């Protein structure tokens, strides 16, 4: 099997993956700020790094996968006040909702899922170390800030030069800062903030800045220097740039070897945003589409490419996934173990080892499905299920998927008992030699998105199309 190569944002190139400890991978991914339901952009991040950790395990690595939860933040505080509920009540509720969405999408839980509020002492310890090392200062307004010009390598991840960054582009001007580009490590508490929004510290009551949360949790759980750090493309700057400055400023060690960033989600070729009114939660999408269809829709696009969300693309994903399940419908796979020397498995592995190239891996699944359709071979069916399983796909009994309503069928299609009643009426028409009526029922069902297949012995099976 070829070596795994990962596109490293830091190097701006694909690099052969060499873990710090042979056979072990330590990976941290920036998770979700829990003040609302997860949206399609979150779904992409969750699925992408689920695929990454699945593949790392599949090729034999012992993986420690950490994905954090931000459960203290200005948006969280505002939403809790608006709702008249405590911060903990709000965050617990949306953490539960996030877990429900993950389960629906077939996402395996990370090995460790730390909440920011569980690591306040570690954050304060890192801030104090940064102050001792000359990277942090307490401003006149009580906030503790990071002095970006003290860190010589600032900009190495994003490629941005401090001299080219203008105050006000991404940070608001603040007279208390020594430099407008400095960012907050510890926010001084305000008098009108609710209970649970601040902690005691040598700097006074306050709460951590967003960036220090991930540095402290990553270093605490995975060590000062670990293998992979991931997140959405929008986090590359300033969040991940600031994480590097904090962590390396505090420890004097390289923070992360490989930086991975998944691409944006677009809606009809425009960036998804609430202001454009093209913003969809995972729950809204799952009301209309089967969760495995949504997962497949995400999987079949390379993780670094833009993902264009539209009903047309989801309908196409459903049709494509239906083709894969249909290939398995009448073939019982054998029970042998996956053999990486099999040609299809080799092509699949080569694709996944080429920076997790899921479009090519999925193409291999369709090659297999075509061969299964032609040969009805049990070993090929087994390979199809096994390789798809590494992507979190084709885990259901084929007929259960094929007869399940989703998309347009879910919104207004026939229920299973209605379909069975129509099939019974068609059987009765055929027995009465009223073939015109039998054909009419078949055509009517097909127009409603139901395909019939007459089997030897007189039975009829159906599936949604």
UniProtKB/Swiss-Prot annotation:
Manner of cofactor binding, per the entry note: Binds 1 zinc ion per subunit.
Record keywords, A-Z: Aminoacyl-tRNA synthetase, ATP-binding, Cytoplasm, Ligase, Metal-binding, Nucleotide-binding, Protein biosynthesis, Zinc
Enzyme Commission (EC) number: 6.1.1.16
Reported cofactor(s): Zn(2+)
Motif 'KMSKS' region: chain residues: 271-275
Catalytic activity: tRNA(Cys) + L-cysteine + ATP = L-cysteinyl-tRNA(Cys) + AMP + diphosphate
GO biological process, one term: cysteinyl-tRNA aminoacylation
Compartments, as annotated in UniProt: Cytoplasm
Motif ('HIGH' region): 32-42
Domain of life: Bacteria
Binding site for ATP: 274
GO cellular component: cytosol
Family classification: Belongs to the class-I aminoacyl-tRNA synthetase family.
Subunit structure: Monomer.
Protein name per the record: Cysteine--tRNA ligase
């Amino acid at each position: 099997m070829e070596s795994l190569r990962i596109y490293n944002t830091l190097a701006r190139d694909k690099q052969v993956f060499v873990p710090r400890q042979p056979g072990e991978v330590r990976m941290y991914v920036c998770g979700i700020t829990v003040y609302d339901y997860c949206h399609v952009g979150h779904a992409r991040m969750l699925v992408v790094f689920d695929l990454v950790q699945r593949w790392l395990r599949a090729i034999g690595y012992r993986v420690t996968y950490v994905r954090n939860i931000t459960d203290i933040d200005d948006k969280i505080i505002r939403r809790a006040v608006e709702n008249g509920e405590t911060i903990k009540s709000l965050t617990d509720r949306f953490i539960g909702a996030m877990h429900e969405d993950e389960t629906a999408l077939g996402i395996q839980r990370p090995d460790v899922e730390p909440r920011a509020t569980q690591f306040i002492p570690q954050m304060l310890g890192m801030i104090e170390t940064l102050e001792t090392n000359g990277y942090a200062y307490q401003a006149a307004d009580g906030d503790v800030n990071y002095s970006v010009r003290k860190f010589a390598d600032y900009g190495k991840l994003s490629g941005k030069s401090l001299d080219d960054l203008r105050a006000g582009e991404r940070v608001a001007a603040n007279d208390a800062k020594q430099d407008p580009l400095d960012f907050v490590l510890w926010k001084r508490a305000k008098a009108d903030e609710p209970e649970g929004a601040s902690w005691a510290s040598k700097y006074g009551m306050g709460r951590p800045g967003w960036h220090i949360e991930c540095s402290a949790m990553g270093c605490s759980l995975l060590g000062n220097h670990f293998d992979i750090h991931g997140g959405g493309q929008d986090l590359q700057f300033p969040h991940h740039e600031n994480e590097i400055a904090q962590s390396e400023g505090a420890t004097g060690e390289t923070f992360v070897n490989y930086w991975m960033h998944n691409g944006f989600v677009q809606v009809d070729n425009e960036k998804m945003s609430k202001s454009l009114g093209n913003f969809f939660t995972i729950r809204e999408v799952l009301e209309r589409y089967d969760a495995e269809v949504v997962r497949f829709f995400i999987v079949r696009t390379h993780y670094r490419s833009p993902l264009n969300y539209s009903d047309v693309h989801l309908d196409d994903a459903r049709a494509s996934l239906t083709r894969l399940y249909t290939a398995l419908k009448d073939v019982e796979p054998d029970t042998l173990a996956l053999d990486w020397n099999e040609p299809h498995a080799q092509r699949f592995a080569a694709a996944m080892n080429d920076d997790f190239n899921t479009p090519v891996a999925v193409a291999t699944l369709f090659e297999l499905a075509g061969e299964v359709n032609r040969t009805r071979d049990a070993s090929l069916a087994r390979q199809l299920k096994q390789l798809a399983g590494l992507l979190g796909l084709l885990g259901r009994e084929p007929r259960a998927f094929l007869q399940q309503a989703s998309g347009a069928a879910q919104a207004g299609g026939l229920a299973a008992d209605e379909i069975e009643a129509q099939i019974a009426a068609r059987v009765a028409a055929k027995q009465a030699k009223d073939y015109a009526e039998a054909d009419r029922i078949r055509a009517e069902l097909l127009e409603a998105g139901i395909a019939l297949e007459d089997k030897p012995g007189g039975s009829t099976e159906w599936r949604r199309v």
